[in-house]
Each structure stands twice: as structure tokens, then as C-alpha cells.
A protein has these predicted regions:
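Active-site-adjacent betaalpha module
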Residues: 1-28, 57-60, 64, 77-190
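Conserved H-loop
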Residues: 74
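N-terminal nucleotide-binding beta1-loop-alpha1 segment
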Residues: 30-34
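A short alpha/beta connector and helix-capping loop motif
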Residues: 25, 43-71
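Short acidic, Gly/Ser-rich segments with clustered Asp/Glu that frequently serve as metal-coordination loops
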Residues: 36-41
Length: 190
């Protein structure tokens, strides 16, 4: 068993921790910083292209269920020209129902994210993206403070090191929500 095999797997003889499934009318997928230059970084434990593919798979499932997908990207204030590759990966932007531009590590501070989610009636967030211990965790902490139910798709996120990723996934995220593999994210009735 590898370090990442401890997460529940639907269809592996165990019930998903999300049973009986998520409500698509109350759930949104929030994708953090899936930008060209960030996805291209050397990441661990999941390579950037793998995180991207897994995140896009989640986005397809959310869109098929009628649940919103929100893509978040960072744009640092006071920097007249952002570094090359600062846009979202094109497929992420195309999959998103809304794009939120943040100016800090987390996606809620001084953005329209909370208002966007509340207008849609969202109470549960499935969070994915890069980096696990930075943008994902900062966003999750703020979401918890705002009383969102949180689900972390562990294989749809990564960090600069496996140790940083694992510290968030094993120590911090379970205090705020449920950590699962993306295969365990499903909607009620499916």
C-alpha cells in the first residue's frame, strides 16, 4: 500500500465516505490556480499534467450533473505585466462556469467567489488545484470559516514537494472536511 492508497475507493468493497452522494444543486467544483506556468512546475506527488487531467475529469462530471465549476487564478497586484503562462490552461477556462481572479493566496479574500457561490445556492465545495498547501489550503480554510462543507479531491491537487502535499492532506484537511480520491466524488442518484 502506498502513502496515497489510504483514501476510500468507491467500488473497492467499501462505501464511499460521500454516500449517498453530493447534491448537484448545492455543490460546486473550485479549481485553484490551474495556470499554464503553475501546471508546468515540477510537482509532487502528482505531476501537473496528471492533476490537470484529473481536475478536467471532475469538471466534466460536474457539468454533466448540472453542478457549477469555478476556476480561480492568481494575478498579483502592483505587477503591470504578469509572468508568461499566467492564464488558465485553456481547457480549464472552457470548462468553467465562472472565473475568479484572486490577488492573494486564497480565493475568498477580496473576490466575488463567496457571492458567486451563494447566488447559486452552493453549500458544498469540492476543491482541487495547485498548490495543495498554498492556494488550495488557504481557500479551504476561508471556506470553512464561511460554513461551506468541504470535500478535497486528493489526486486532483499537488504541491512542490510530496511532504507539503501530505501534511495538508493528512493533518489539516481532515479537520475541515472529507478527503477522497476523485473517483469517489459522485452525485446522489448516479
Amino acid at each position: 500500500m502506498t502513502d496515497h492508497d489510504h483514501f476510500s475507493r468507491a467500488g473497492a468493497g467499501r462505501e464511499s465516505p460521500l454516500a449517498p452522494g453530493l447534491d448537484p444543486a448545492r455543490t460546486a467544483l473550485v479549481l485553484i490556480d490551474l495556470m499554464e506556468r503553475i501546471v508546468a512546475l515540477p510537482l509532487a506527488p502528482h505531476p501537473g499534467p496528471e492533476v490537470l487531467d484529473t481536475s478536467l475529469g471532475l469538471a466534466r462530471a460536474f457539468r454533466a450533473a448540472g453542478a457549477p465549476v469555478v476556476a480561480v487564478r492568481v494575478q498579483r497586484p502592483g505587477v503591470p505585466e504578469q509572468p508568461a503562462g499566467s492564464g488558465l490552461v485553456a481547457a480549464v477556462g472552457q470548462a468553467a462556469d465562472a472565473v475568479v481572479v484572486k490577488h492573494t493566496v486564497g480565493a475568498f479574500h477580496d473576490t466575488c467567489l463567496h457571492d458567486e457561490l451563494r447566488q447559486r445556492g452552493v453549500t458544498t465545495l469540492v476543491v482541487a488545484g495547485i498548490a495543495t498547501n498554498m492556494g488550495v489550503e488557504s481557500t479551504a480554510r476561508a471556506a470553512a470559516d464561511l460554513d461551506y462543507r468541504l470535500v478535497f479531491a486528493e489526486d486532483a491537487m499537488s504541491a512542490l514537494t510530496a511532504a507539503e502535499h501530505d501534511a495538508s492532506v493528512r493533518l489539516d484537511f481532515p479537520r475541515f472536511g472529507t478527503v477522497v480520491r476523485s473517483a469517489d466524488v459522485y452525485f446522489a442518484g448516479t
